[in-house]
Amino acid sequence: MTDLRPGLTAIVPAAGIGSRMGAECPKQYLQLAGRTILEHTLTRLLSHPAIAQVIVALAPHDRWFDTLAVAADPRILRVEGGAERAFSVLNALHVAAGEWVLVHDAARPCLTHGDLDALIATAMACDGAILGSRVRDTMKRSDGAGNILATVDREQLWHALTPQMFPTRPLRRALEEGLALGATITDEASAMERAGFTVRMVEGRADNIKVTRPEDLSLAGLYLQQQNARQPAQPDSPTEELA
């Protein structure tokens, strides 16, 4: 059995508005299988034995989080989110208690403990690691008008997923330095790569999807249903004990 070293901090940037969903509330507060997307996400993290703290970065005028039952969990700490993901994560890093942090998208409610176990084991043996899925479709490069310029070799291409796990202090420095220089930081791995760290890919499950568009809601609901059917539900945690 892998030593998972309890005491990790998970960071969940949840300050975005999710405009592509076209909903009246931010996408993380949309209902999915009886709970909000964010509740599913937080419950998956909180139920893992290695995670001792979850920091949620919220929009300054968020009026939805306090209505969630999970908001009362004493392991959850709130910070103010920024205009971009990197600023939200950096605000959370300033108060993170653990030596290692996992950053996970608020709108990825189908994360399993099996993927978390694999990520933790790999990250702690190197500079850090992220979950990913291999590109399986044929990839094309186009010009600005949409004309195909080339077919791209997909052999070494991955879709970056979350969580992404790194040592707390190096990640904080990497984000601070990158932001100070105006670098484009699309995820935590890009900041660490820029700072010279070697980041490992860990192949994750295909059902660890991010809810971005309206059609993703039904797909995420199907994945949750399938995951629950494979493992008996626990009395107070119907979706979180999944491998």
From Swiss-Prot:
Keywords: Isoprene biosynthesis, Nucleotidyltransferase, Transferase
GO molecular function annotation: 2-C-methyl-D-erythritol 4-phosphate cytidylyltransferase activity
Annotated site residue numbers, Positions MEP for the nucleophilic attack: 154, 210
Keyword hit for Nucleotidyltransferase: yes
Presence of the UniProt keyword Nucleotidyltransferase in the record: yes
Broadest EC class assigned to this enzyme: transferase
InterPro entries: IspD (IPR001228), IspD/TarI (IPR034683), IspD/TarI_cytidylyltransf_bact (IPR050088), ISPD_synthase_CS (IPR018294), Nucleotide-diphossugar_trans (IPR029044)
Database matches in PROSITE patterns: ISPD
Matching SUPFAM superfamilies: Nucleotide-diphospho-sugar transferases (SSF53448)
Catalyzed reactions: 2-C-methyl-D-erythritol 4-phosphate + CTP + H(+) = 4-CDP-2-C-methyl-D-erythritol + diphosphate
Superkingdom field: Bacteria
Enzyme Commission number, as recorded: 2.7.7.60
Pathway(s) of this molecule: Isoprenoid biosynthesis; isopentenyl diphosphate biosynthesis via DXP pathway; isopentenyl diphosphate from 1-deoxy-D-xylulose 5-phosphate: step 2/6
Pfam families, alphabetized: IspD
The family this protein is said to belong to: Belongs to the IspD/TarI cytidylyltransferase family. IspD subfamily.
NCBIfam families: ispD (TIGR00453)
Record function comment: Catalyzes the formation of 4-diphosphocytidyl-2-C-methyl-D-erythritol from CTP and 2-C-methyl-D-erythritol 4-phosphate (MEP).
Protein name: 2-C-methyl-D-erythritol 4-phosphate cytidylyltransferase
